[in-house]
Amino acid sequence: KNRGYSRYSPQIFIQNLNQEEIAQLQQEKYKYPGVDIRIRTLRDYTYPIASHILGSVGEVNYHDIEKDDYYVVGDYSGRDGIERTYEKELRGKKGVEIFMRDSRGRVQGPYRQGELDLPAQAGTDLHLSIDIATQQIAEQLMHNKVGSIVAIEPQTGEIITMVSAPNWNPGKLVGKERSANYQQLLDDPQKPLMNRATQAQYSPGSTFKVLQALVALQAKCVTSHTQYPCNGKSSSPIKCTHDHGSPVDMEEGIEQSCNPYFWALYRDMLQQDGYQDNHIAFKQHYNQWREIIASFGLGKRFEDTDVRDQAAGYLPTIQFYDKIYGQRGWKAITI
């Protein structure tokens, strides 16, 4: 559906011609009265990186046109990433030219010599917190790998690097090959269009140990001087992958990333006060632990951010474990 269609108004017949095609058409254009070539701007990406951050632009569809009267057939808009988040800021404002037409709708010239015309306004420049050098290094590190890297400025919370691998060259989704290239990305079994930095769910790994220590101190079930034994690879039920002395206090547990220390710490948090066989008290302690962990933002989407398409993490509830293991069938080691 082409709103504003008129047989006397310019209509797009074909677009995104290359130089060779333009030259060929110029030679034959005299045979086709009414055919003209017009130049328009097209998105250009300086670096072949940061595809999941930048996103892409694509031609608007019927729903876009119905939703926003800014668009007409042939316009482009941001489809994902920063391109979509800041579409209204980046697109600027269209210019206006008023023409006089005859009874058949044919243009007769500008109205009042164009004094009511309005010039187009360029979109706003957008400055990201991404550090291009760091982004390039991170993408090189993730070449031929699957996963993500995110680097954040601690003082401000700004994202300086965000990589999801595999990714693609954002320039591939510009121009006449966009549809074919996009379909190729859709069909790729490694799902390069998925932003693993914001949409995948991963276990936090050893970075979680520092948070675990803070929660234990807040719960006052241990002190920083509380020690637990570590027998290295012979430890049970959790083995240690580092070579260090025993017993281990909190400082050394963090420094050595000692698995047995943090297993014992977590066990005592949930079974404190001698409630090892009291599942009511055990679950109360689990709920307290879960609430504190959630207060750090785990299991939640980021708020007040321009990072799109986030998937929330998951902090299992008591009901989750009860359903899988039964009401008395799970312990600290299960978690």
Can you describe what each PLM-predicted range is?
Residues 1-177, 201, 285-295:
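Periplasmic/cell-envelope proteins involved in peptidoglycan metabolism and beta-lactam response
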